[in-house]
Amino acid sequence: MGELQNRAHRRQSSRRIAVCCAPSRQDRRRPNASLCSATTPRRLYGVLLTFAAIAAAIAVSPQSAQAWGPNAQKLILNKSIDTLPPDIRAFFDNGRAQLLEHVNDPLNEKARKPAERHNQFLYLDKYGRFPFTQLPRNYKAAVAKYGKSKLESTGLLPWQVGVYSARLTEALRLGKWEEARLDAAILAAYVAETHDPFNTTENFDGHLTLQNGINERFGTTLIDRFSSFFPMRPNDAAFISDPTDHAFESCLAAHSEIEIILLADRNARLNTKPYDDEYFDRFYNQAAATLIHQLSQAATDVGSYWLTAWTNAGRPQLPH
C-alpha cells in the first residue's frame, strides 16, 4: 500500500446548504454531453431491469468504479487547507502545489495497478442492511470472518484511510517533511473517496437501476460544469479519535445519500434528451445540495485527518 508514495517520491524528491439554481447557459461552459440511450418505455422496464442486472454480473467488474473526478479531488483539497488552525496551515498552504499535483495519484495508479482499485471503495450493501453491522471494522476480525479475497472484492477503503493516516503521523513525527506532504496528498484522496456515495454501493455506476454512468455525471460532470457557482462551507478541522472507524462512518453517511441522487437523475431525465444541457440543469438543481454537502464534509475531514496526524505525532514544529 506504500507504492503510491514511493513512486511519487521518486518523481519529486450544518447539514444541507442552500444553493442557487443552475446558472444560465450563457454564464457557463457547456462541455459535450455524455452519450446514453433514450429512456426505457414503462412496459419494458421490468424486463430490461432484470436483463441489466444479469448483464452487469457478467460484464461489469467492481474495478470499473469511477471515483470523484480529478477536479473534485483538487477542489476538496484546496478547501481543506482553509479548515486548518494557524499552527499547521502554513505548512500545507506553502505545499499546496505539491499536494494538488499528487492528490490524484491513487486515481492514476488505479489504471496501472489493478490491486490499487480495491483501496478506493467499500460496497457496504454486500454486508446486509444499513448500518451494515455484519462487517467488522477491525481488519483482522474482518479477515477472520470473511477472508481476504472477499474483503478485497468488496473494497478496503476505510482501512486504507487508517493506513495512510498512520503513515502521515510517522512522517511528521520523524520530521520527514517532503514525505509528509506526499502522504498527506494521498491520504486526502482516500478520505475524499469515503464521501462519494457511489463508492459505497455495488450499484456504483447505476447499472443495477438502468442509470448507467450516474457516478460520473454526479461526481465529475456536475462539478466540472457548476463548481464556480456553488458554495462550499467546510467546518474547522477537528481531532479524530479513531481514523479507521471515522472513515467507516463517512462511508455510511455517504451511502445514505444514494437514493436522493438516483431520484434526482430519474426526474432530470424526464422529457429531456440524453444527456443535454437541460438534463444537467435539472439534475444540478435537484442534486446540488447533496453534492455540495458531501464535498464540504470531505474537505472538513481531510483537514481533520491532517490535524489528527500532526497531533498524534506530538505537535512538531512544522517548517514554513
Range-by-range predicted roles:
Residues 185-193:
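Extended, hydrophobic/aromatic-rich amphipathic alpha-helical segments that build helical scaffolds
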Residues 61-182, 186, 202-296, 300-320:
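N-terminal, motif-rich segments that launch catalysis or mediate targeting to/interaction with membranes
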Residues 46-59:
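Bacterial N-terminal signal peptides
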Residues 5, 9-12, 26, 45, ...:
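Low-complexity, intrinsically disordered or signal/transmembrane-proximal segments
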Residues 40-43:
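Short polybasic linear motifs
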Residues 192-206:
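Catalytic Zn2+-binding segment of zinc metalloproteases
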Residues 20-21, 36:
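Cysteine-centered motifs
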